[in-house]
Structures are given as C-alpha cells and as structure tokens.
UniProtKB/Swiss-Prot annotation:
A GO MF label: structural constituent of ribosome
Main location: plastid
Annotated compartments: Plastid, Chloroplast
Domain S4 RNA-binding: residue ranges: 91-155
Native source organism of the sequence: Cyanidium caldarium (Red alga)
Pfam families per UniProt: Ribosomal_S4, S4
Subunit structure: Part of the 30S ribosomal subunit. Contacts protein S5. The interaction surface between S4 and S5 is involved in control of translational fidelity.
Name of the protein this chain belongs to: Small ribosomal subunit protein uS4c-2
Gene name as annotated: rps4
A GO CC term attached to the entry: chloroplast
Keyword Repressor included in the entry's annotation: no
Function recorded in the entry: One of the primary rRNA binding proteins, it binds directly to 16S rRNA where it nucleates assembly of the body of the 30S subunit.
Record bears the keyword Zinc-finger: no
Source organism superkingdom: Eukaryota
Family label: Belongs to the universal ribosomal protein uS4 family.
Amino acid sequence: MSRYLGPRVRVIRRLGALPALTNKSPKKRTIAPGEHAHKTRKLSEFAVQLQEKQKLQYYYGITNSQLARYFRQARRSKSSTGLALLTMLETRLDHLVYRAGFAPTLPAARQLVNHGHVKVNGKKVTIASWACEVNHVIEVKSSSPPKPPEYLPPYLQLSNGTLTVTQPVQKEWLAFVVNELLVVEYYTRVGA
C-alpha cells in the first residue's frame, strides 16, 4: 500500500482533528462519514486502539508497515516505547519542514523534500523519512519566505529561513492529541 490519496476530510470526520493532513475543515458535516454514521455505539477496546494507530498513520502520512517498523525500533530503545515512537515520528524530515511553516500541509512538505528543495547540514536530502537529530540544521530552497507557523515547538529554532533541532522531543509539544499507549497496546496485541 502506498500513501493515502483519498478524501482527507472524510478521514478528519472519522478520526477527529488532524492539522497536518489538510487545511480544509468539515464545516458542513460534523458527524462521521458513512450511511449509518448518526447511530452511535460503544467501540470495543481493539477499535479504540486501532483508531489511535490510524490517527498516527494519517497524521504523519505513513503506511501501516512503516509504522510497524518504527514501533519495532522504538521497542528496542532504552526509553519508553511510546515516547520513543513519537520522537521518531516527530523528527522525520518532512514533518519538521511542515512544523517550521515551510509547507502548508504534510503532503506539501513531503513533496518539497522529494523534489530536492531541502538541505540538511548543507547536503541535499530527498528522503522524506530522514531521521533528524539534535543540532541538525535544515534549509529549504524557496523563492518565498516561510509562513510563520502557528505554534513552533520548543525543540525547534527558526531563524533566517533555517531550522535547527535544539533538543529532544517531549510529548507535551505534539500538535494533536494522541494516546501512544493505545498504539503500543495495539502492536503488542497484533504482534508487530
């Protein structure tokens, strides 16, 4: 399966607010998509875990196999598995380009990276999943100045069109609400 190219507002209606997915908002319809969306029923424990996993998947624009690979790497880390998973996802190059305001959405940031408009420490990088570390300097070749982001997390520093990762990521600095423990429970249950 490749990247999700379907209707993004439908995903937002189903999973809740995902700011990186699109600039549009579901103004007309606030209920979930589908024929029987108005009928509410209690979700099972597995369904809640699956929804949290899908939130991460759609927000960061990655596939199920990529998220499973990140989970396996996070499980091997010495810190908390959930925090390590979120740190890996937050420090992806395409996500940092989006968070700095160089692109309006995550798919646009991914395209900037893929088309070779981004340099990391002075070297051109075309891999959207590039893992940035502390003290990495990110520059975007652009004719227009970046739009100032609504919220620049404390682990990023933006000056003169360059972005610097200054410290490790904390959970409080995420742009949306996610319960990473449910994602960890999901992957331990399905055996990733």
